[in-house]
Amino acid sequence: MASAPPTRRLSSGELAPSDEHSLVPVGMATILPEAARHVRQLESELLTCFYRYGYDEIILPTFEYFDVLAPGLEPALLENSYKIVDRTTGRILLLRPDVTAQIARTVAMGMLGTRLPLRLSYRATVFRYEPDHVGRDRELFQVGAELIGADDLSADCEIIMLMIESLRQVGLPSFKISLGHVGFFKGLLVRAGLSAEGQKLAEQAASRKDFPWLREILERERVGKRSAQSILNALELCGKAEVLSKGRTLAQGEQPLVQALDRLAQVYELLCSMGFQDLLLLDLGEFRGFDYYDGIVFDVFTDGIGIELGGGGRYDHLIGRFGRDIPSTGFALNVDRLFRGLNLVDTTRTVTSAVLVVGPVTMTKELVSVSRQLRQVGVRVIQRAVTASGQDLVGAAADAGLEADIPTTIVMGADQPNREHVVVLSRQQMGDGKTGRSPLHRKTMSMSDFTASLRTDREGAS
């Protein structure tokens, strides 16, 4: 499916660069506190969904030795990787450009004897150089899952179903899965007799859906008009089941092409039987931009985001580059793009509200004690000592709550007859999650009653 280059992300609460004198390198992100909470919550929700499917989280190093990881990465990706020299050994280090290759290296070299199939999940930051004019980020926040040691039909369906269910779990209401098989398009290129370099360039053009560039490559390679037209036609074959019959016409009975279509048809039919037919589009030109994919591949798109939210596919020979041939499949989601997609639908994702505890500086000890008591209940508490006293204290506390945009404020020491009692100030949160100038409600109650009400609210929410 065609996708337009995105603009630089700012919707995740990122600080906007001023100009060429920006303090943050181009393509890197500073995510501000409110958005950071949402992003971390989103990552946690995804990993929880993966865990329920039996996927265990793995934490991988940010740096890898160049010579160790290089077998799993194509030359173009290595060229666009950030490299530094290890001061201790003098060896070249890579700043992580791809997680799947890291997992392949880990499984092949560090998890010998592990029972297969193996289900792994991760959250990681990936770094890749992109030219300024492309508009892509150079720092990518990813959450992903890998199913290692299974090559049957159910494995392909499981990993796609996991991606679908996780997107639904986090609240993305509308999206499409573009489903293909790299063996079909590669087979057409092989049949056309392209040189090794020409095939590589054609694959890159296909992954970008760049028709003019692909046509130029085919002309330069002197591919016959009929073969060239078949390749260009395949890149446009996108739709439902009818796409498969058109693909079989292009295959002309050649076994590698037919086998790729057969596997694609089986995966598509099984997913449709599970009720996912409305989410799926068959794309015979689907071609992910990594050379280790060799089977079923897929991308996910949503309205309003001009680039895929994520994707993945089968890589049966990648781990073999590190010494052990193990069939595998997996996917990664771009957390920032997914966050943007969710923001287009709902800007008020749930985050646990805080309570502001305000008291005079003369009651600092009691202030700390009450704050600790509330935290033990599981509440996020911000404490603040002020110089005001008496009724001025309530006004100062109300102003502090408004300034901090916190809906509930507890005021200690406001001339109550019983020091066990506090004044509770509350404002209604508006539709955007802010309190704004909504009406202020005041209530006097004991700390034990307030704590009990918090427990009841939290139990009801769960």
Residue ranges of predicted features:
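Phosphate-rich ligand and nucleic-acid binding surfaces
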Residues: 30, 190-195
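Short, conserved phosphate-binding/catalytic loop or strand-edge motifs used
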Residues: 137-143, 179-187
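TRNA-binding/sensing appendages of the translation machinery
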Residues: 1-101, 157, 161, 176-178
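Acidic, His- and aromatic-enriched active-site or binding-groove loops in soluble protein domains
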Residues: 80-88, 193-218, 276
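Short, surface-exposed recognition loops or helix-turn segments adjacent to catalytic cores
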Residues: 174-185, 202, 280-287
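Positively charged, Gly/Ser-enriched RNA/tRNA-binding surfaces
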Residues: 2, 35, 41-53, 64-65, ...
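Short Asp/Glu-rich motifs
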Residues: 69-70, 186, 208, 338, ...
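Short, solvent-exposed helix-helix connector turns and helix-capping sites enriched
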Residues: 181, 209-210, 239-240
